[in-house]
Structures are given as structure tokens and as C-alpha cells.
Amino acid sequence: TEVERIKRLMSEAGLRISAQGVNQFTKNHAANRKVFDLAKRLGNRNISADPSEDSFDSLEKLVAEYNVRIAIHNHGPGARYDKIADVLKAIKGRDPRIGACADLGHYIRSAEDPVKAIRLFGDRLYGVHLKDFAEPKKDAKGVILGRGQLDVIAVYKALKQVNFPADGALSLEYEENEKNPIADVKACVAVALDAAAKA
């Protein structure tokens, strides 16, 4: 099957899938189950999600059945979960496997403190997107990690403080310089590695 082929290729490369998504979820339990089934078959513990309000009863049943986490992703200004408080409200009182995927760049764009987000989500943080923007506004320009608003060392210190899970999804995200991003991505990786060593 295609799933088995993907698993084989990942294994041969020494890689594992840490997350999938961002998935939309509704109250349609059968459709939601298909996403969880794929995650389980891929050996993935984390599904990044933008769930509708009416999806949470279904999601609670599925996270318990599959032991796969939901990590609510913030999409920036004007999105359903663009503020830290929006995600905290959504996960309050829910199964602890329903938590957050903090896209740090989008929190910058929403004028929220990315390090504060990590600390507030605490042990409900299952995904982090390392991304930086030049300024805290909706149409801000993306920049190489550490050259904008993101304090990368403080991010890693906060991740240590909240005991970010070893099987959580820590992703580097860079969307600029589409025609030739390799040098910029290498610079982002260097900053991330340096910050991790200093944290």
C-alpha cells in the first residue's frame, strides 16, 4: 500500500513522521476517524488541527481510542485560533491529548508573545513551528530565524521548562525566497541548533 511504501522510505532515510496536518475537523465522526486511522498507520502521535467547535466530542473519543494527540494550530490574525486565549479556551476541560501546536510566527503576526504561548500551553504543547517575522503585524515579512521578533534561545529555554515531549513535533518553517530557499533554510537551521545548544 501507499502507507507501507511511505513508512519504508522514511525508515530507510532514518526519519519518522512527527505530525500531519493542518487538518480540518467537524462533527463528522467517520471523516475524523479516517485522519486518526492514517496517523496510527504511519506511527504518528500528533495531528495538527483547526477543529470546528462542534468537533470536540468526536475528537475526545478518537484521541482516547487511538492514543494520538490533537494539536490546535493558530493561523494568525483573524483566524479561529489566532490568540493564545482561543486555544486555551478550546482545550480547557478536554482530554489532555487535545492540546496546542504553536506556530510562533503566526503568534508574532497576531501580536502575541510566542514564548508566553509555550509557557501557558505547558504540558499541552505537542507541536511547535519555528518561524520568524520582521514585525508584529498581519502582513509582516518572514525572515531568517532569529533576525526578526523571535527570541530563539528563549523559545528553547521555554520548551525545556515545559518538558516538551520527545515525540512532539518541532518543525522549522520558512516560506520566503521560494525560487532558491536552500541557503536561507541552512541559516535558519544553524540558528536553531545554536539556540538549542545555548538554552
PLM segments and residue spans:
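Glycine-rich, flexible loop segments associated with nucleotide phosphate handling
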Residues: T1-R5, A169
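Histidine-acidic metal/acid-base catalytic patches
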Residues: A85-A102, I108-A199
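Active-site acidic/histidine proton-transfer and metal-coordination neighborhood
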Residues: V3, L9-G99, I108-A111, L120, ...
